[in-house]
């Protein structure tokens, strides 16, 4: 069993095995790494170990001291490129060429057109939505709430639905919803997916119901596909939890009250249209950290320096040109 576990972990941490693969990481790095001892250095090591081709960062804030924002500092350490623009915290980080950049809102969306070493281009967006009235906490604190009242956590008591609609509207205006290139949309949605709140998960998880949660439904209705659920369609067998590996309860070594564990960090790929010369197909997925650290370790001393897990998705480039087959 120990041998199998080590082998499985080594397989996950291997980077893309061929030029036809693309690895994308989505990660909210907790306040620019400032909340954990040597947080920026630990974040750098996580990225180096994961070997992504693209990192969609959230909370890329100024590093305490005389260093720049986290994304800029990581790019310098890795010898990569990055785009954060006027955003307070959103960043696209990559070794690839950045041919164009896109800006929606300083808090909610930045994007970039990237080109890999073989000349294949795609668009990647880093996004973040309102954290208030987290539906899992609403159900935890008010278990008597009706389904309609819970949905209002998304539609009325937070700005998530309005922000998602504005973001998707901007992508449509930019032409990214009928783009002739693959389009990725990833980040911290601060809400679960309707694909995870089902009758089966309601039976297994203490704080879930079978609900058509609106934010993820909006994204799917706009033509995007949830890459993690494409690989792992069963949310009971593969929950993909990203909130929270750091804060898990109310023990002395932690902060806060018992959590509502959810997959709030996600990566979507837009369903391909007929004009694409090649498309990106998700082929594997995992969430970091693979093993959660002991909850007896104070949060500021953790090796994994964030309260959010990182989503890592491997894609394969598939040619749609019949002449290339």
Question: What residue ranges belong to the model's regions?
Answer:
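Sec-exported extracytoplasmic/periplasmic mature domains
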Residues: 48-52, 75-79, 98, 172-176, ...
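Extracytoplasmic/secreted proteins, especially bacterial periplasmic and envelope-associated proteins
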Residues: 38, 42-46, 69, 73, ...
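Short, solvent-exposed loop/turn segments at secondary-structure junctions
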Residues: 31-32, 62, 97-98, 129-132, ...
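Structured beta-strand-rich core segments of catalytic domains in phosphoester-bond hydrolases
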Residues: 36, 58-141
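Active-site beta-strand/loop signature of hydrolases that rely on acidic residues for catalysis
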Residues: 22-29, 43-67, 124-126, 153-200, ...
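A solvent-exposed, charged loop/short amphipathic helix patch at secondary-structure junctions
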Residues: 135-158, 200
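Metal-dependent phosphoester-hydrolase catalytic domains
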Residues: 103-106, 113, 173-184, 191-325
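N-terminal, active-site-proximal structural segment of metallo-dependent hydrolase catalytic domains
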Residues: 2-7, 12-77, 118-122, 297, ...
């Amino acid at each position: 069993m120990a041998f199998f576990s080590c082998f499985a972990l080594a397989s996950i941490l291997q980077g893309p095995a061929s030029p036809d693969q693309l690895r994308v990481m989505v990660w909210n790095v907790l306040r620019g790494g400032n909340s954990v001892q040597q947080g920026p250095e630990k974040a750098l090591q996580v990225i180096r170990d994961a070997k992504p081709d693209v990192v969609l960062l959230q909370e890329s804030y100024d590093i305490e001291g005389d260093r720049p924002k986290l994304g800029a500092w990581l790019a310098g350490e890795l010898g990569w490129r990055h785009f954060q623009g006027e955003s307070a915290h959103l960043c696209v980080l990559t070794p690839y060429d950045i041919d164009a950049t896109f800006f929606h809102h300083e808090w909610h969306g930045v994007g970039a057109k990237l080109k890999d070493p073989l000349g294949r281009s795609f668009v990647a967006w880093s996004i973040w939505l309102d954290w208030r009235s987290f539906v899992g906490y609403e159900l935890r604190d008010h278990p008597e709430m009706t389904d309609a009242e819970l949905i209002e956590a998304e539609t009325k008591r937070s700005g998530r639905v309005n922000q998602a609609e504005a973001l998707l509207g901007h992508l449509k205006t930019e032409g990214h919803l009928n783009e002739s290139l693959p389009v990725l949309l990833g980040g911290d949605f601060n809400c679960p997916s309707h694909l995870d709140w089902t009758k089966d998960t309601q039976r297994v998880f203490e704080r879930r119901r079978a609900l058509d949660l609106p934010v993820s439904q909006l994204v799917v209705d706009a033509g995007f596909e949830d890459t993690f659920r494409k690989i792992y369609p069963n949310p009971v067998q593969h929950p993909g939890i990203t909130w929270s590996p750091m804060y898990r309860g109310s023990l002395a070594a932690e902060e806060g009250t018992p959590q509502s564990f959810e997959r709030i960090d996600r990566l979507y790929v837009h369903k391909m249209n007929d004009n694409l010369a090649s498309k990106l197909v998700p082929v594997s997925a995992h969430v970091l950290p693979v093993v959660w650290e002991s909850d007896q370790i104070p949060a500021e001393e953790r090796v994994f320096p964030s309260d959010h897990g990182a989503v890592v998705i491997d894609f394969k480039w598939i040619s749609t040109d019949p002449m290339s087959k």
